[in-house]
Amino acid sequence: MIARAALACFAALLLAGCVALPPQTAALQARPPADLPARTERAEVPFFAQTRDHCGPAALATALADIGLPADPDRLADAVFLPSRAGSLQIEMLGGARRQGAVATRLPRELEALLREVAAGHAVVVLQNLGLDWLPRWHYAVVVGYDLAERELVLRSGTDKRATISLRTFEYTWARGGRWAITVLPPDKLPAMATEADAQEAAVGFERAAPPAQAALAYRTLLARWPGNLLAGIGLGNTLNAAGDTAGARAAFETVTERHDSAVAWINLARLRLDAGDAAGARTAAERAVQRADAAEPAWRDMARTTLAATNAR
């Protein structure tokens, strides 16, 4: 009797959870954003049916193919699928996209952000938990459309090329998956809804996997939206230098030092000027590096002084 009562109570809780609208869905339905299209679907997004537990490789292949990059789920499985986990971890999905030449960027944990990203023309890879918190069943899918009037999303999911799911159900499953969502885009494009911090993290991660010239393009793209981003400015200078464009690297670090009093930027500028035969300009930059390091960035003090000594030796 006690067991039956407990089971009945548990069932009632589940039913109550399914009936109630989750908060973000409720907000969207109560106050649909006036500037958000009521319906969008990108029917042209490719589809790769999932095989075995390979929803991660299939979803990643879908996103890569959508931007014209090589997309073979079987080959991607070798890179992102972990047999011991019978699935793909988020970090493997990010790395797999970057190794294929795409910038994978985290999106805000908001349902509206997903809809706006799709409205901007970008497929969105999401992680759902189709089970329960204590009995998870992880699943990757790709959001390719939505209909606010019908209150549903359109997904590339599993073996279904056009799976529809209610906003309510999706939010429950997405929330249980940590509200994880990414865009997979070429380095000359940014997600519509990414924050500066997430775009910066994505560019830095891309640099670790991409050729220097492609990484430089990603930093240029980020700087076009956030021109004052210090890390992106330094990253642009470093990747241009690694790509052999020393003149471009010097120009990049000159721009950084015009915006920021950064010891590492001054050090890099001094070295590039020295390599170009501009001893006087190098010395000026090195002196600024020492001043900044002494004043606020002691971690760079030794390198700044070493750089200054090198300029004095010329």
Task: Outline where the language-model segments fall.
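C-terminal motif of bacterial Sec signal peptides marking the signal peptidase cleavage site
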Residues: L14-G17
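Noncatalytic regulatory segments and standalone regulatory/sensor domains
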Residues: V19-A27, A149-G235, N241
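Cysteine-nucleophile protease catalytic domains, especially the papain-like/related folds used
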Residues: V19-E110, L114, A120, D188-K189, ...
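Active-site-adjacent substructure of cysteine-protease-like catalytic cores
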Residues: V103, L107-R156
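TPR alpha-solenoid repeat register
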Residues: A232, A265-W266, A299-W300
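Canonical tetratricopeptide repeat
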Residues: G235, N268, D302-M303, T307
